């Protein structure tokens, strides 16, 4: 097997391929241009979107050329793959704004140089396309009977599938054809939920040009408990630091299950496999800390990773920079005569209700790091917190349970 494909397989980026032997032979002979697509249906990429883009970087490092295709056109419809109901239709203006955000995030992660990594947008050929011409030229190449055999459609037949969504496969297939014409792209990679769309695109190119192209998919990434990877209590793990603060991003990786650490090292870092295996022979908590730092550094940069690490250490009662932690300002007047811990955890937002805050304290899940720099457990629901409990920076660190932290900053 080709070296680049071995790397993908070794690191967990391989589920199935349309013709692994043919693709391997081609990649041995020449530099292959391939593409990854993503639709800007939200204001930020999340970590689930990034799996194929990590693969893109691995393939680029072995001499191949990757195209990141932003679906400024297909986002106007919405891909039904992996969805149980129709996506909300969003305005063209919102899509265009999302495109700009996606492009900035991907450029930061990939670095588009026009040679080894390219950026394209299917809005350029889809937005003003003539419907009649498209259906005559492209629609005639598709069999409805065959389309209905793909899982992405079969799963939706019982719950309802609009014609708008049903036509999505034609558009994604057309993307592959256009990229083949524009850039000699001969490989599409993506999650395994895209298998039907990828195969359809390869078939379309064969019908139109007589040439063979390839498709390769990755497993859908799940945690060891079977749940979808990259989900938090607050939703998806976004790349936008406003939507997911860097500290929270870091803490997600720091708190993954032991059984997931090696898998996530392989998928979401660029450390050599031998180095990962060496890390895994040591203390598991140190391995998780390293994982959190590495992934945060890849996505947000080394400086932000350092700040998040320092904030995590400070949150556990050690010394360190707390500036990266989720922060809330609170007026000093709230502490005149003292403020009860139940009210404090409720006002901070760490507990949704006062009853929840009371249970948190009673069950031993409430912690404070104050003026002595040491974290302590709150055991008395009647305890009062005063202004003097804040440290000399005017900070008080709260923790609810194992994973929720907040830095309170006193405003005079």
Predicted regions and their residues:
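NTP-dependent nucleotidyl-transfer catalytic core
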Residues: 1-194, 199-202, 209-214, 227, ...
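Conserved nucleotide- and phosphate/pyrophosphate-binding catalytic cores
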Residues: 205-412
């Amino acid at each position: 097997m080709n070296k680049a494909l071995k790397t993908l397989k070794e690191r967990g980026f391989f589920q199935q391929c349309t013709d692994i032997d043919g693709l391997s032979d081609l990649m041995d002979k020449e530099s292959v241009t391939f593409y990854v697509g993503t639709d800007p249906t939200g204001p930020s990429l999340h970590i689930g979107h990034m799996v194929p883009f990590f693969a893109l970087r691995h393939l680029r490092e072995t001499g191949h050329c990757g195209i990141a295709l932003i679906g400024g056109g297909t986002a106007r419809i919405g891909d039904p793959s992996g969805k149980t109901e129709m996506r909300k239709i969003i305005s063209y203006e919102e899509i265009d704004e999302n495109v700009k955000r996606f492009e900035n995030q991907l450029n930061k992660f990939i670095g588009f140089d026009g040679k080894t990594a390219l950026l394209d947008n299917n809005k350029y050929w889809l937005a003003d396309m003539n419907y009649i011409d498209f259906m005559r030229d492209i629609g005639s190449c598709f069999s409805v009977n065959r389309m209905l055999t793909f899982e992405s459609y079969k799963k939706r037949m019982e719950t309802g599938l609009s014609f708008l969504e049903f036509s999505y496969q034609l558009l994604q297939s057309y993307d592959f054809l256009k990229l083949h014409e524009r850039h000699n792209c001969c490989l599409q990679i993506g999650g395994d939920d895209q298998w039907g769309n990828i195969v359809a695109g390869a078939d379309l190119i064969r019908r139109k040009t007589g040439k063979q192209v390839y498709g390769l998919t990755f497993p859908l990434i799940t945690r060891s408990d079977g749940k979808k990877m990259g989900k938090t209590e607050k939703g998806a793990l976004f790349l936008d630091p406003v939507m997911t603060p860097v500290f929270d991003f870091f803490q997600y990786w720091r708190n993954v299950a032991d059984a997931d650490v090696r898998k996530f090292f392989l998928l979401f870092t660029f450390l050599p496999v031998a180095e990962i295996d060496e890390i895994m022979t040591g203390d598991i908590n140190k391995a998780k800390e390293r994982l959190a730092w590495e992934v945060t550094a890849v996505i947000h940069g080394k400086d932000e990773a350092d700040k998040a690490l320092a904030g995590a250490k400070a949150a556990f009662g050690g010394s360190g920079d707390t500036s990266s932690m989720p922060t809330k300002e609170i007026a000093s007047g709230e502490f005149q005569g003292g403020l009860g811990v139940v009210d404090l955890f409720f006002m901070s937002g760490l507990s949704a209700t006062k009853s929840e805050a009371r249970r948190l304290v009673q069950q031993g899940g409430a912690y404070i790091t104050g003026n002595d720099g040491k974290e302590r457990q709150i055991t008395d629901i009647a305890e009062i917190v005063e202004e003097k409990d804040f440290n000399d920076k005017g900070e008080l660190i709260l923790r609810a349970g194992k994973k929720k932290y907040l830095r309170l900053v006193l405003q005079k």
